């Protein structure tokens, strides 16, 4: 019988540079693990580089679909879109939500900058970031 719970996996697109992830993706699709949902933070950045400078991941949704997954691609900053993907009717396959996002969104000096993947802000930068995020509300 099918499991009556759902399992969620959250991963970054940089992790998709690793073969073991694709082995697991292929296995889950082959076995029809319909209670499994993966959420990919597709910000196109990883430790030290842009993902596309390491290995080209696009067309990412087509790759997941080829391994038997339902694909839901959204604006990763749109919480309603995320909810719709997660709450939508379930099929007989695992589901992936590809959440296209912008690392550092809302903070001018952090947006889409590789170095902020691991960098710690100074006290001044932290205060500026808080102010910018507060102004965006």
Where are these regions (language model features)?
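Glycine-rich ThDP/TPP pyrophosphate-binding loop and its adjacent helix/strand module
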Residues: 1-137
């Amino acid at each position: 019988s099918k499991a009556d719970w759902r399992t969620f996996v959250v991963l970054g697109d940089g992790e998709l540079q690793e073969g073991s992830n694709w082995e697991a993706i292929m296995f889950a699709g082959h076995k029809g693990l319909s209670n499994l949902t993966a959420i990919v933070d597709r910000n196109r950045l990883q430790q030290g580089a842009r993902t596309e400078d390491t290995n080209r991941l696009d067309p990412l949704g087509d790759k997941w679909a080829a391994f038997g997954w339902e694909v839901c691609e959204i604006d990763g900053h749109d919480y309603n879109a995320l909810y719709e993907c997660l709450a939508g009717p379930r099929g007989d396959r695992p589901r992936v939500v590809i959440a296209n996002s912008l690392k550092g969104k809302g903070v001018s000096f952090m947006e889409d900058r590789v170095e902020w993947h691991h960098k710690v802000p100074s006290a001044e930068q932290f205060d500026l970031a808080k102010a910018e995020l507060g102004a965006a509300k």
